[in-house]
Amino acid sequence: MRKQRAGLPPDARADPEHYRSRASHETYRELGERARDELARTGGAIVDATFRRREDRDAFTAAVGQGARSPVFIECRAPRDVLRERARRRESDPRSVSDATVDLVDRQLDEWDSLDEVDAARHATVRADRDPPDIVDDIEAFLDQRTASGVLRFG
């Protein structure tokens, strides 16, 4: 989304300025609008973003709207050294389209705002330093539990 908003091709590296506060606010607002439209069209949407600042989450949530279709936040956590190593691998891979650098990872972790404002029924934390199938299993279990309890509705 950031690259699209900046008029960059998907395989270009975005300038760090595209990750600053004002640009992020607008990006998250637009992500929320797109998620809202997708929810109306298909009944579901998955948005992959850091949501590291409360103001970004607020912009996204305001654009999506409230009610049974309010956002659910899945917080994927991993140790700093794991995230830094992943960024190093992406930086050295000429085929990578990721903007992640070790400096960006460090800055984002240092600027992290906890999700205190998010209702526990709409927030799960999963360890992201495991095999992907295990992570997916945890996310599915969380969503299944919330759907069964009526917190979430799909379709």
Q: Each PLM stretch: what is its role?
A:
Residues 1-43:
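Conserved substrate/cofactor phosphate-moiety recognition/catalytic segment
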Residues 1, 51-52, 77-83, 130-132:
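Conserved nucleotide-binding/hydrolysis micro-motifs of P-loop NTPases
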Residues 67-88, 126:
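Conserved phosphate-donor/acceptor-positioning beta-strand/loop module used by diverse small-molecule
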Residues 8-14, 64, 90-93:
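Short, hinge-like loop/turn segments at secondary-structure boundaries
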